[in-house]
Every structure is written in C-alpha cells, then in structure tokens.
Amino acid sequence: MISYFSYTSSWFRDVWECRLTVEEKKHGNTDLIFPTGIACAQPSVSNSRPDVSTTTPWLAPIVWEGTYDLTVIDNIYKQQNITVAVTVFALGKYVRFLKDFLESAEQHFMVGYRVHYYLFTDRPDEVPTVTLGEGRQLTVIKTETSNRWQEISLRRMERIEKLIEKELTDKADYIFSLDVDCKFYAHWGAESLGDLVGVLHAGFFGTSREHFTYERRPESQAFIPLQEGDYYYGGAVIGGRLDKVHKLVKTCRMQLDVDRANHIEAAWQEESHLNKYFLYNKPSKLLSPEYLWDDTKGKPSYLKVVRFSQVFKKYAEVRPNP
C-alpha cells in the first residue's frame, strides 16, 4: 500500500493540537513475555563472542551475530503486535538509491512484522514501484529540497520530530531513521529493538576517541571535549521507541537551531549533534558495525555478517554541492 501527502510549512504548526502527545502515548506491553511450550537452546554462561565487546560500560548490549537467539526474540516480540516506522530521505539525485533500498528491506528488514516506510522526497513521481509484503506500507511525503547537502542533512531531525508528533503517536511503537544510500544484505530483525538504539560507525570502530571527528569547537552546541566520548555513532541509523527518539530528535533540532542562530555548522551536521546527545543520554542498545558497514571496505574477521551497508557512489555526482 502506497499513500501520498504533501509536506508543507503548515505541517509544523500547532503541534499541541495532536490528539495524543508523544509523552502520553501508551506503548502497550513492554514486558519480555515468553510463551509457554516453545523449545529453544539453553543459553551459554560463557561469552559467545570473545573477539569483540558485547556490552558497554553502562551494561547496554552491543548486538553481534552469535550473541542472541532469534527464536527467543521473535517469540517475545511477535505477540506484542508491534509496528515499526521507518523514515527515509531521498532528495534530489538520491532517489536513485530507493529501489535497492526498498527491495532489499522487503527481503531482510523486520520480516514478519508490520512496517510503515515514510519516504521524504522532492521527486514523488520518481518513486519506484516496489512490491510490499503483507502488513507493510509506504507513505510518500513531498518535501522541499536544498541546493546544499549539508542543509538537507541538518533538516532531518526537525522533519522526524514533526512526523512523530503529527502522524505516529498512535500508529507505531518503534521508529528507525535509515539512510537511503544503503542496502540490506542479511537479516535485520527484532534483535535491534530497544528504548534508544545507536549504531557503531564502521570507520571509527576500534579507534581511540581523540581521533573521532566529534565537533571540537566550543562555540557549537555539539561540542565534545577531547577527553570525553564513548564511541563514535553513525548518523545513518537511529532507532528506538517513539518517545525516546522524539526526545533525541527534538533536542538535536533545538541545538541545531542555536547553532544556526550563531552562524555555526557542526562538523558533520546532525551526526555531530547525535554523538553529543548519546554521550550524555546513553543508548539502551548498540548495534555493531554489522548494521552499518561500507561497501568499499573489506570484511574483517570479527565481522561475521554484513546486514546493512552504505553503497558505493560518487558524491560529486549525487550531491547538489561539494
């Protein structure tokens, strides 16, 4: 099922008129109830992945192949009857990545669950026809583009914030924001669900934090001092429950507004603000680089599977400006 609506300035107004606020939304049962009569393997008491870290210092799990039992997870989450919203931005020439993104998502992303894609694009006539599975739908949101890719990046937080407030409070339980210039190569399922979910950036995995490309200028709201920082998170994947993600994108949007008023742009736009947010608001679950790899990279021994990866592209060809 595909539906369309226009994304205009009026969509930003009168947020308080929503029938339900994000904070008031009842998320339903969040208990991890396991049904009776289901046979599964006995968990091991030893570390199943000694080659990588599987927990953070604040005891959030880092999801790797071999660290979970999908039978257990699906038996817990499928009875909750959840809906997962996915925001995708395909502005300008980035619309060319849509077909591979959607077709591969239908093969691998949250298969067996209700999924609603929300596609922001300035080229609705170029949206490809993709067969969607049962319980899965696509809404196309006509959106203004920009002649600067940096501005396109900066506006995403605001657009996700308003989408949650105006459309999703009674329509979804979880939300993921995923970059369109990526492709799914393997299973991505309910093991990725959590209150607030970030992904470890493949380019900085195993790198000391003084080499992270955090925003280092104190004038920016995204500023992180050299002696601080846990991980470097990729902005191509953000997820979690609606209320948690809403708080994240609203906070980042407010910080972006302050920076804009002060005529400063963080080093990596919304990704810089995301890293600042996650430093002081720890994610409850981290996805390993399996969930955000890069097609131009080789496959190291610790990477047992590539689930989602940025595809090769010539940025000068697809971006509206250098």
Regions from the PLM with identified roles:
Residues 120-127, 182, 186, 292:
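Short, polar loop motifs at secondary-structure junctions
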Residues 119, 176-179, 239, 286-288:
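A structural signal for short, well-ordered beta-strand segments and their strand-loop junctions
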Residues 1-155, 163-170:
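N-terminal anchoring/stem segment of glycosyltransferases
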Residues 220-314:
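Catalytic core and acceptor-binding pocket of nucleotide-sugar-dependent glycosyltransferases
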Residues 86, 105, 117, 160, ...:
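Structural signal for hydrophobic/aromatic residues that build the beta-strand cores
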Residues 157-208:
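GT-A fold catalytic core of metal-dependent nucleotide-sugar glycosyltransferases
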Residues 207-222:
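E2/UBC-UEV (E2-variant) core
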Residues 97-99, 128-131, 186-190, 297-300:
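A short acidic (Asp/Glu
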